[in-house]
Amino acid sequence: MVTETEKEMERRAYARVGLLGNPSDVYGGRAVSFAVASLWATVRLRPSADLLVQPHPRHDLVAFPSLHALVDRLDGGGYYGGVRLLLAICRIFHNHCKDNGIALEDKNFTLSYDTNIPRQAGLSGSSAIVCAALSCLIDFYGVRDKIRVEVRPNLILNAEKELGIVAGLQDRVAQVYGGLVYMDFSQEHMDKLGHGIYTPLDINLLPPLYLIYAENPSDSGKVHSSVRQRWLDGDEFIISSMKEVAQLAYDGHNVLLQKNYTELAKLMNRNFDLRRKMFGDDALGELNIKMVEVARSVGAASKFTGSGGAVVALCPDGDAQAELLKSACQEAGFVVEQIEVAPSALTKEELASLSSHP
């Protein structure tokens, strides 16, 4: 009989939208985020004699028809594909198991990946690849019950940190858990538990939401940099603004439970306005700001899904306003689509295990 660990497997992780609280997750704050069902990364693992990480035929190109084609590819997609992400999570997974006395069977595999998440659009495409790969490794080695759900986002983030990617835990929590999640990253929890407090919520609490994006590659890692230093230096404006952003997620959690979407719209707008004041227009980028302003021109609430490249919008006045939003976005040359939220990614056993830890 062929077991799960002896045959090919495929695992999926979804793009993430930060609804409220970003970027305070990097600063001991809070966040409300969810996974997007239409955008995902898949990783395939099959047993093999040698350990092989396969490059993607499009994202890891090393052969080109011409020098011009090579430059076009680098201008549009940068130098990095997904192979480095797979290598990094393999190393982090191995070392975590070694450090925690988790025995791994001596066997090899071949990893490959695919993704339809727009590159550098603030939708956590990189961490989706890492998350899906971690799921494959956990199941291939049969250690799902030995690596707690709450710890998995840390492993994903550590893999990305190895590659110099600047980010917080929010994205990885949303992708490990799936669905809609409220997160508290207060330093007290991080110091005591080694992770935040993550609360899965019913996805039906969300109103209709819209995703707006442009093909506008922008290195989201750079957006955090100067603000981070000012925060470390004790800049009072940055510290107080980050606290307010975190409070928006706290308030938003309660607003969602009440399905008070008029108030949710106000919180979303305030979130973006605070980000803009902290980071400045040059860091946010003209096209990113335009996406927000186009949505707001029809009265929709809007904010970045992450650090730029895509926007999440809410139409508090309903369907007629949503039609206006679609027209305005299309006229401006932006992609707009209604969001379908991905369901929880956790098993019944994993959901039950969450309640047994504070």
Where are these regions (language model features)?
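C-terminal nucleotide
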Residues: 2-20, 24, 33-37, 41-105, ...
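Short pre-catalytic strand/loop immediately N-terminal to key active-site residues, enriched for Gly-Thr
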Residues: 117-121, 299-302
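Short, conserved phosphate-binding/catalytic loop or strand-edge motifs used
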Residues: 111, 150-156
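Short, solvent-exposed loop/turn segments at secondary-structure junctions
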Residues: 26-28
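Gly/Ser/Thr-rich loops at beta-strand to alpha-helix junctions
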Residues: 309
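DPxDG-like acidic metal-binding loop motif
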Residues: 122-145
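Short glycine/proline-rich turn/loop motifs
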Residues: 69-71, 112-116
